[in-house]
Amino acid sequence: MNTLLTHGYFLREDPKEQLIMKPYPPLGLLCLSAWLDKHGVENEVFDTTFSSKEDLHQYLLEHRPRILALYTNLMTKINVIGIMRFVRSRVELRHCLIVLGGPDVTHNLEGYLAAGADLIAIGEGEQTMLEIALTVDGKRWTGDGGENRDDLILTSMSHITGIAFRLPDGTVFKTAPREKLRDIDRLPFPNRHKIDLHQYLDAWKRAHGHSAVSISTQRGCPYTCRWCSTAVYGQSYRRRSPEHVVDEIVHLQQHYDFDLIWFVDDVFTISHKWLGAFRDELQKRQVDIRFECITRADRMNRDVISILKDCGCFRVWIGAESGSQQIIDAMDRRVDVAQVRAMIQSTRRAGMQAGTFIMLGYPGETERDILETTRHLREADPDLFTITVAYPIKGTGLYDQVEAQMASTALPPWSEHTDRDIDFPRTYPRRYYDYAVRWTVNSVHWHKTQNTGRRLSVAGLKFLVKIWVARAGMVWWRVKGAYRSGSSKFILKPIR
């Protein structure tokens, strides 16, 4: 085998996702595979989602690929490192060239190269991976796993842009940046036929009674939110034509039985002109779909909501991250919280579901900001919302902001933790925010029971108990944090 594409996500190791059970296939790998196929490069995809580490190890030993390409993100870092260690430990795989790509590698070059990677593809990977594969296929690479491995990489791979590798003296070398693909209509449809997509559809069907597929229509995001990583596609905006996207939808409808589409784009309604053309193309070709997407409140209005509904949208996720304008501004979100509420409400009035995202524990956030966020959720009244506690991803503005403060945080070795494990000094201790999340969630749900006339129901009383318990936890950790810091500035005020 020439090239094997895989990743390190195993559903059986993710108890949260097992409860949610909304898995999607690795589109990035499937796009790489399709690009390689288009240019005549033999490749296979081993999808780990429904598999096991043992299955992957056995596959590697049986097929002995010349190139092992691993997609790497924050969630899969530890497993990817484990896969590399397995390859390096087996003499049968000594010729295997390990290539990493994905959002977590760009700002962690030294760590991944030290952990066993031969090459790292920085940014978009299609053309980079093609050139690596052609180099190996042309026998310019004869890696033997010996002491001269770094010399071989230097002499055979240094002509390829957009990669990083170690020089013989151990230092990390980056070639010139890879130019981004401007016309992404040139990309073939993802190679979904190389994995068992029915496993995903069946998992959805068993858990929810319907199934879903994912589609990407754009690359890059022009916004500068300080907590968000743009490590792969950068701060750009490139869009497939509406015709090309509808072609893919029709192709999927012809080959698979699914109910919903999840558009994975960061801001689906960023271009109103594109959105209108997309609707026209769907209607012209009489293509019926139901889908959900993500967007920003400032890229929505009544006309956009109407077009989304015409297209078949049933749910819109509208980013906010906070109900406090002060925190939104600190995040560089460049959106007005009142506009977020208005768009959530307008979306629901139009007959679609509205979801939103919230982040607690951002630098500078106080209990007053958390209260404003909870009030925001009560007033906006989205159908769905998710809450996370802020963590710094390397390469983001948030990471740069708190990096100096992270130095004193005790962490395991780099290869044994992810950015999610990193903490930094906040207004309150880290445990405080776990209770703040519970308080916010249950407060909003209790408010919904009031609006539906179930204030004294069993469900409403359960929410009240959870609110009191969460509030007690917030008070405890707030007082404990103030005591540890020697501060006397903690006044216990009720939250209403």
Features from the language model and the residues they span:
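Acidic, low-complexity intrinsically disordered segments
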Residues: 1-246, 255
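Radical SAM [4Fe-4S] cluster-binding motif and immediate context
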Residues: 190-357, 375
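Short acidic/polar active-site loop segments enriched in Thr and Asp
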Residues: 66, 118, 258-259, 314, ...
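Short helix-capping segments at alpha-helix termini
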Residues: 40, 89-95, 283-288, 349-352, ...
